Amino acid sequence: MAYKIAVIPGDGVGPEVISEGRKVLDAVSEVENFEIEWREFPHGAEHYLKTGELLGEETLKEIERCDAIYFGSIGDPRVPTGVLEQGILLTLRFYFDQFVNLRPVKLFEGVPTPLAGKRPEDIDFCVVRENTEDFYVGAGGRVKLANASKQKAAKGAAGAGKGVERQVLEIKRSLYQLKFGLEIEGDADEIAYQIGVLSRKGCERVIRFAFEFARARRRSGGGGGAGEGEERERSQGQGQEQGRSRKKVTSVDKANVLTHAYGFWREIFSEIAKEYPEIETEFAFVDAVAMWFVKNPENFDVVVTPNMFGDILTDLGAMIQGGLGLAPGANINPEGVSMFEPIHGSAPKYAGKGIANPIATIWAGSLMLEQLGERKAAEIVLKAISEVLRERKVLTPDLGGSSKTSDVGDEIAKKVKAS
């Protein structure tokens, strides 16, 4: 079997950690007798600064011919915040409709956690984050009402003292296209606003994914990859110790304050939960969950949440599992091209020093193998990661070691080849 993988190393430490990920994946492909054809794309800060190009339609079509995307990191202080994120990372998520962001939160043996008294069996759950809607749809703006008021006064118009601004916002997704016509009137000098959107289908599909994921996770004793139907059940083996019997989905929102959007989310969650009577369910507000992640992480199995809350909570999850260098993410379209990445940023101050932890990227590669149906290969990689962490002989500085990025990649690849 041969797989074509689009590689976008990106910025900062991205190329360094991606290099180690490729090293390990190439090693396991030899062990398991499949081929990986890497198709590298230069898109990131350097490419943007030289060419002004982000991700165009032609490049996206080329990536679409690949089986998956292996992504490093994005972000550079020379480029205004949001340009690369919107033009590359979010473009990939939205173009390929990667509506699930799956993030395992797992403490490995040998890795210290800031949570006193918590053991690996206590920190082992997955967050399923809706990945294409909520406040990340890109609908918003800024309005200087004071300027509009002055213009009206200069013209002697009625209602001088209040500014009026008209704006049109458009949202285009695979599920829908929306257009908002806004007329803003007031005496404030300047305002900014952001619109969050949840659709019924968008909520249904990610919530149903979470329930199917919880069901398959319990059957296999784990959970970390994703597919559809039998393929999903077959390909989920990471993130849970064998023998644990919890089967629970926790819905996280803020429906007590943001009643329209998240009350809608709760309603849909309740409807879908009825289809899975064997799975325990609970509702929780996001502020409470932030506390419980720290106080009682053992109470969680599968957490499903809208986009913004998931973005925030999974960084907290990363810290309780040992840090961002150990936290992978999968952006999944079960029927299309999915993308796999570490959740850490580009960390430009560490770029070129050879000290970035590549384990999150290597683990993301394991998740990619699961998604591709190479479950045994995925398990081999995860086992090698686990052994390196347990032995604590070859670790980067963030985990108390003195090894280089490449040393960690070499050690994991060596264990893969010896499996």
Located regions from the model:
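Buried hydrophobic positions in well-ordered alpha/beta secondary-structure cores of metabolic enzymes
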Residues: D11-G14, D67, V128, A210, ...
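N-terminal glycine-rich phosphate/adenylate-binding segment common to multiple enzyme folds
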Residues: L49-L182, M308
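Glycine-rich phosphate/nucleotide-binding loop
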Residues: H47-Y48, A290-K393
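N-terminal beta-loop-helix "entrance" segment that forms/cooperates
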Residues: V31-E57
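Active-site rim loops that border cofactor/substrate pockets in soluble metabolic enzymes
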Residues: E40-Y48, V257-V303, D311
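Flexible, glycine/charged-enriched surface loops at secondary-structure junctions
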Residues: N33-R39, R217-G221, G239-V252, Y276-A284, ...
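Extreme N-terminal starter segment of soluble prokaryotic enzymes
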Residues: M1-I5
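Glycine-rich phosphate/diphosphate-binding loop of Rossmann-like nucleotide-binding domains
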Residues: A6-K23, V28-S29, N147-K150, K155-G159, ...
